[in-house]
Amino acid sequence: MRPEKLDAEAIAEQLHRMEGWVLAEDGASIWKAFRFRNFAEAFSFMTQCALAAEKLNHHPEWFNVYNKVDVTLSTHDASGLTELDFKLAAKMDQAAAGRMPDHLK
């Protein structure tokens, strides 16, 4: 079953609860830059997020260089944002908690 695309009001409400996530200019995706102490922490984060993504059957677009992981979330089947994007964003924030140095949060 295809996830339902969220309207602008629902997206704004969800983003209000999410720290650091930014709505793309086109309104079709959200993104966040995560920074960690080192590569091992970044890779550990990505591994934990990959397992969560598999459970949700919803997968991020991400880019990793050393301690940096840039994430973009969108639901391509809905041509925009759905609840799945915000569920995965919350899981990613949980996975990052405790791994990110305070000065990088």
Curated annotation (Swiss-Prot):
HAMAP family assigned: Pterin_4_alpha (MF_00434)
Origin species: Sinorhizobium fredii (strain NBRC 101917 / NGR234)
Similarity comment text for this entry: Belongs to the pterin-4-alpha-carbinolamine dehydratase family.
Keywords linked to the UniProt accession: Lyase
GO molecular function: 4-alpha-hydroxytetrahydrobiopterin dehydratase activity
EC number: 4.2.1.96
Matches recorded under InterPro entries: PCD_sf, Pterin_deHydtase
CDD domains: PCD_DCoH_subfamily_b
Catalysed transformations (reactions): (4aS,6R)-4a-hydroxy-L-erythro-5,6,7,8-tetrahydrobiopterin = (6R)-L-erythro-6,7-dihydrobiopterin + H2O
Name of the molecule in the record: Putative pterin-4-alpha-carbinolamine dehydratase
Class in the EC hierarchy, top level: lyase
SUPFAM superfamilies: PCD-like
Gene3D superfamilies: Transcriptional coactivator/pterin dehydratase
GO biological process: tetrahydrobiopterin biosynthetic process
